[in-house]
């Protein structure tokens, strides 16, 4: 029974490490892109995100500009 508790604790710590690592690569909404962002606006979204200091950007199905590498 003690081994299961230690295994669970190790699993919980590993999950925190993995989730923390993924957070660094998460996307965030652009703060400067105005208006709806459709598929044909991808280049504009990328440019605005790069101006914000992000690695790139893309338009989502919800018509928002998401910057990558936040």
From Swiss-Prot:
Signal peptide range: 1-20
Inducing factors: By bacterial infection (at protein level). In hemolymph 6 hours after bacterial infection, levels of expression increase for first 24 hours and persist for the following three weeks (at protein level). Up-regulated by septic injury caused by the Gram-positive bacterium M.luteus and the fungus C.albicans, and by M.luteus or E.faecalis-derived peptidoglycans and by B.subtilis or A.oryzae proteases. Up-regulated by Gram-negative bacteria in the respiratory epithelium.
SUPFAM superfamilies: Scorpion toxin-like
Pfam families referenced in this protein's UniProt entry, alphabetically: Gamma-thionin
Prosegment residue ranges: 21-26
Chief site of localization: secreted
Glycan attachment sites: 42
Entry GO terms, CC: extracellular space
Biological processes per GO annotation: antibacterial humoral response; antifungal humoral response; antimicrobial humoral immune response mediated by antimicrobial peptide; defense response; defense response to fungus; defense response to Gram-negative bacterium; defense response to protozoan; killing of cells of another organism
Disulfide bond annotation, renumbered to this chain: 28-70, 37-59, 45-65, 49-67
Tissue expression summary: Hemolymph (at protein level). Synthesized in the fat body and is secreted into the blood. In larvae, expressed in the visceral branches and posterior spiracles of the trachea.
Keywords (A to Z) from UniProt: Antimicrobial, Disulfide bond, Fungicide, Glycoprotein, Secreted, Signal
Subcellular location(s) per record: Secreted
Function of the molecule: Possesses antifungal activity and is active against a relatively broad spectrum of filamentous fungi. It inhibits spore germination at high concentrations and at low concentrations delays growth of hyphae which subsequently exhibit abnormal morphology. Part of a psh-dependent Toll pathway, which may function in activating the systematic immune response in response to localized melanization of the tracheal system.
Protein name: Drosomycin
Species of the source: Drosophila melanogaster (Fruit fly)
Lineage start: Eukaryota, Metazoa, Ecdysozoa, Arthropoda, Hexapoda
Gene label: Drs
